[in-house]
Structure formats: structure tokens, C-alpha cells
Design a protein with these regions (language model features):
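Helix N-cap motif at beta-to-alpha junctions
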Residues: 46-50
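Conserved short beta-strand edge segments in small beta-sheet-based binding/regulatory domains
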Residues: 34, 62-67
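Short amphipathic alpha-helices in soluble, non-transmembrane regions
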Residues: 18-22, 54-61
């Protein structure tokens, strides 16, 4: 499954590293690509192991707001 998550506070390389590290550690994540300009996270994942809500919760736990 592929999902696009929009993050309000995604502004710099440090944000990319923080979010990428947290999401990549989730079981079921196959690929992740982050676009700072669009404030988007594109995630390919196994929807039997993980839901988009699991990833949203993870990002929000880091202090970011989801659009």
C-alpha cells in the first residue's frame, strides 16, 4: 500500500532525518520518501502489518502536526 502524509512543520533536513528514522523503524515499512518543499511523506508499506494511522500517530508523537 502507498500513502501520502502531509506534515505542517516539515521545514528542514533535521525534520527529514527525525521523521525518516522514526517511520523506518516501524515493522512493515518498505520505502519512505520525504519532500520538504511539498511537506509530504510518501510511504510504501505492508498494510497487513501497519496502518496509515500508526504512522500518523508516530509522527504526531514526535511533535509534528498532520494536515
Amino acid at each position: 500500500m502507498r500513502s501520502v502524509i502531509k506534515v505542517l512543520e516539515l521545514k528542514n533536513a533535521s525534520d527529514v532525518v527525525t521523521i525518516k528514522k522514526a517511520i523506518s523503524n516501524k515493522t512493515g515499512v518498505l520505502a519512505i520518501q520525504i519532500n520538504i518543499e511539498k511537506r509530504e511523506i510518501n510511504v510504501v508499506y505492508d498494510d497487513y502489518l501497519l496502518t496509515v494511522n500508526d504512522m500518523v500517530d508516530c509522527i504526531e508523537d514526535l511533535g509534528y502536526s498532520i494536515l
